[in-house]
Swiss-Prot record:
This is Uncharacterized protein SYNPCC7002_A0852. Disulfide bonds: none annotated. PROSITE patterns: PHYTOCHROME_2. It comes from the Bacteria.
Length: 162
């Protein structure tokens, strides 16, 4: 009985390690491809409450690992748009129509340009793949498509792991 319990714990641990390795590779690849300051995966652990669980950085000063983000700003309306496949692309947050709550949060983590794609697993919003840049940046169509495809690939891989 003890051996079986230990095996189950080890299996869960291996799945978690494999999942985290997959997510880390995807964020590293995305940051390298886009040449941005930071790429993160924001995971929703309950309805519209989440945390940055993986990040890839150009410089350690950009770290927000473990951040719970602007949970008070994110709501069902935002979630619904992402569930419908919305890709958020902002060239300059200062010229955007973000609400003050969201804008203040992005400023606090030194985001100037933002590109975000949903990670949808089993028809639920599992998380967000977000590319942040500390300077104004115009996102190219192929960059937007790359991030969309990365998020879809991650969603498929995560679904297979569960």
């Amino acid at each position: 009985m003890f051996d079986r319990s230990l095996n189950r714990v080890n299996e869960r641990l291996n799945r978690t390690l494999t999942r985290n390795q997959l997510l880390q590779q995807a964020t590293d690849q995305t940051r390298w491809q886009l040449r941005v300051s930071r790429v993160v995966i924001y995971y929703f652990y309950r309805e519209w409450k989440g945390q940055v669980i993986i990040e890839s950085l150009s410089q350690s000063e950009f770290s927000i690992l473990g951040s719970t983000g602007a949970d008070d700003c994110f709501n069902g309306d935002y979630a619904q748009r992402y569930l419908q496949g919305r890709i958020l692309q902002i060239t300059d947050i200062e010229a955007s129509d973000f609400d003050p709550c969201h804008l203040d949060f992005l400023r606090s983590i030194r985001v100037r340009a933002d590109l975000v794609a949903p990670i949808i697993v089993d028809q639920r919003l599992w998380g967000l793949l977000a590319a942040h840049h500390h300077e104004v940046r115009t996102w190219l169509a192929e960059e937007v498509e790359f991030v969309r495809q990365q998020a879809q690939t991650l969603a498929g891989d995560l679904q297979l792991m569960d």
